[in-house]
């Protein structure tokens, strides 16, 4: 009996807490709704004080533009009250500022995009730029798809170490099927070249030694030629 009473009390308390949460949410929503209505009505009243706005422009005019136009209109009225503000026309003539000159501020503000629209417009690219970016991305994909061994080494690369008299050529061979780099070294055979006489001064010059490669040794050491 006691257990059933405790369970009932817990259920009642949970329902009360749930109802209190719902009521708090509803109250906060109603408060936010009244706040939004007050702000909208205040902006509608502010728009009525801005001249030279068409009815369709008033309906679609954002709040930030309404604030900017209101500040510009206040500055314009201050200049009119001063009486010393002059405006330069297209014919390079000066005339006093009038109330109707505020139409220029209206047209300029309506023409300007909002900040987020302006950022989106600046991010738009022309067709040539898009093609150039796509071509660069395609080339990058092609280069990244080639194996690393093929990118780094050509099928044959020779590296020479030491003087010519003790020349050792190191060939790097790339297997296109397994992309493994194999190294093979062989010592070139040197042969002495005969001295040739100079027909003008009758002196002999030693043209040095030249490497001679035996084709049979190259075939035995190179797996491609086998």
From Swiss-Prot:
InterPro entries the record matches: bHLH_dom, E-box_TF_Regulators, HLH_DNA-bd_sf
Gene ablation phenotype (knockout)? Adults are viable and fertile, but with a moderate frequency of somatic gonad defects, which increases on an ehn-3 mutant background. Low frequency of embryonic lethality, with embryos arresting paralyzed at the two-fold stage; increases in frequency significantly on an hlh-1 or unc-120 mutant background. Many embryos that survive to hatch become uncoordinated, dumpy larvae with variable body shape defects, typically in the posterior. One quarter of the embryos from homozygous hnd-1;hlh-1 heterozygous parents exhibit reduced expression of myosin myo-3.
GO BP of this protein: developmental process; gonad development; gonadal mesoderm development; muscle organ development; positive regulation of muscle cell differentiation; regulation of transcription by RNA polymerase II
The protein's name in its UniProt record:
Hand transcription factor 1
For this protein, the record's SUPFAM superfamilies field holds:
HLH, helix-loop-helix DNA-binding domain (SSF47459)
**Region spans: Helix-loop-helix motif:** 37-77
Q: What does the UniProt entry say about where the protein is found?
A: Nucleus
A GO-annotated cellular component: nucleus
Which gene does this sequence derive from?
hnd-1
């Amino acid at each position: 009996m006691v257990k059933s009473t405790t369970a009932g009390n817990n259920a009642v308390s949970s329902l009360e807490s749930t109802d209190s949460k719902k009521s708090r949410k509803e109250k906060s929503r109603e408060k936010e709704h009244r706040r939004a209505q007050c702000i909208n009505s205040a902006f509608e009243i502010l728009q009525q004080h801005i001249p030279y706005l068409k009815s369709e422009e008033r309906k679609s005019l954002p709040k930030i533009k309404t604030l900017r136009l209101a500040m510009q209109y206040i500055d314009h009225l201050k200049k009119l009250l001063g009486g010393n503000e002059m405006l330069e026309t297209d014919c390079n003539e000066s005339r006093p500022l009038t109330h109707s000159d505020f139409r220029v501020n209206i047209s300029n503000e309506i023409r300007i995009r909002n900040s987020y629209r302006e950022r989106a417009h600046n991010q738009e690219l022309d067709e040539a730029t898009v093609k150039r970016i796509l071509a660069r991305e395609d080339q990058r994909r092609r280069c990244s798809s080639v194996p690393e061994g093929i990118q780094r080494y050509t099928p044959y690369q020779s590296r020479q170490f030491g003087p010519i008299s003790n020349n050792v050529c190191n060939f790097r061979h790339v297997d296109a099927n397994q992309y493994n780099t194999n190294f093979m070294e062989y010592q070139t055979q040197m042969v002495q070249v005969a001295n040739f006489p100079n027909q003008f001064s009758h002196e002999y010059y030693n043209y040095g030694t030249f490497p001679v490669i035996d084709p049979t040794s190259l075939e035995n050491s190179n797996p491609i030629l086998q």
